[in-house]
Amino acid sequence: MLVLTDPLQLLQALIRCPSVTPHEAGALSALEQFLKKMGFHVERPIFTDKNTDNVENLYAKMGNEGPHLMFAGHTDVVPPGALEDWTYPPFEAVIDQGKLYGRGAVDMKGGIACFIAALARVLEKRSIKGRVSLLITGDEEGTAINGTVKLLKWAEKKGEKWTAALVGEPTSVKTVGDIIKIGRRGSISGIITVKGRQGHVAFPERAANPLPLASKLIQALTQIALDQGTENFQPSNLELTTIDTGNLAVNVIPAQTTVRFNIRYNDLWTKETLMEEIEKRLSLVQEKNNSGQYPFYQLEWIPSLGDVFLTKNDKLIQVLSNAIKSVTGSLPECSTSGGTSDARFIKDYCPVVEFGLPGQTMHMVDECVALDAVETLTAIYERFIIDFFV
């Protein structure tokens, strides 16, 4: 019989559901079973959008009044890749030599299992003077269109308001509790299309090669750093991700070149001011080249939901930091490094922090978590829940 206070049992049950985005594969059904046994009211809305898969989500709530703590996460996982590369099958949740193997062990079914077990332990000993909810999506590893962003709006329309949120993403690096995330850099992407005129390489005067202009545009974007970072954020960085002419012939001047890039930006910028800076740099190159003549460029911005943010709720950060210290003996580092997460949506509704297992093996073959790390995180979550409602 499954024991709700045992995070390993819960985690094994979740891993055995092959919930690769956007498939639910029984993961939310397992969660619903756990949570209903604990007294939660559970709903599972399905969201749709054009050109996307339908995605099932879960919202569970307990309590009627007082401070409202949200735990947020996702049950969807990335594909396991070649099964023969795994030491153990990725959806069998095998335990060997002090580790639990399986896709989603750390990203992030482990965090969900630890929080549920921690809450079950708290409820065995005392009642909570407040409200607890779990906001769990099946669309975090995919497009994130039919997941947390819509689930938050759906819950808000039902009258839900939150005091604070904890996202159980794998933020720890070497040991559980060494790092918590109190913010994230923003993310924005663009596509530069340089239009030229195709021709034979032996007759360049009859063509307009887009590559020299593309090189100048790239230099304008990358030669000067966007900034040097701030007190809470590392420097913004622009990275080229694709340079493509679609031309496989060595004797043909291509008709166009496409350059794709992504920028991770800190709190010195807004999305608007950053776009202005990029457009300014590019326009200066075009003016020097030949305005309105071949070759010329076009810039397209890709819609992004990843704005920069920083949580400044000292009480929330302090409660979590003290809970970590009470279990591990050390205070965590407060960080804003790394990629984006669904915290970028939650920050519009309440203060949010992120804290979970060490993530060294996430998205990798043989993704795994140490058994003692699972117990440590559960103990920290338990202490955090108790202290949050004091």
Swiss-Prot record:
Active site (UniProt): 76, 140 (proton acceptor)
Pfam families: M20_dimer, Peptidase_M20
Catalytic activity, EC: 3.5.1.18
Pathway(s) it belongs to: Amino-acid biosynthesis; L-lysine biosynthesis via DAP pathway; LL-2,6-diaminopimelate from (S)-tetrahydrodipicolinate (succinylase route): step 3/3
Positions in coiled-coil regions: none
EC top class, as a word: hydrolase
Extent of the signal sequence: none
Single GO biological process annotation from the record: lysine biosynthetic process via diaminopimelate
Keywords, sorted A to Z: Amino-acid biosynthesis, Cobalt, Diaminopimelate biosynthesis, Hydrolase, Lysine biosynthesis, Metal-binding, Zinc
Record carries keyword Zinc: yes
Subunit comment: Homodimer.
Protein name (Swiss-Prot/TrEMBL): Succinyl-diaminopimelate desuccinylase
Organism: Bartonella tribocorum (strain CIP 105476 / IBS 506)
Lineage of the organism: Bacteria, Pseudomonadati, Pseudomonadota, Alphaproteobacteria, Hyphomicrobiales
Gene that this sequence comes from: dapE
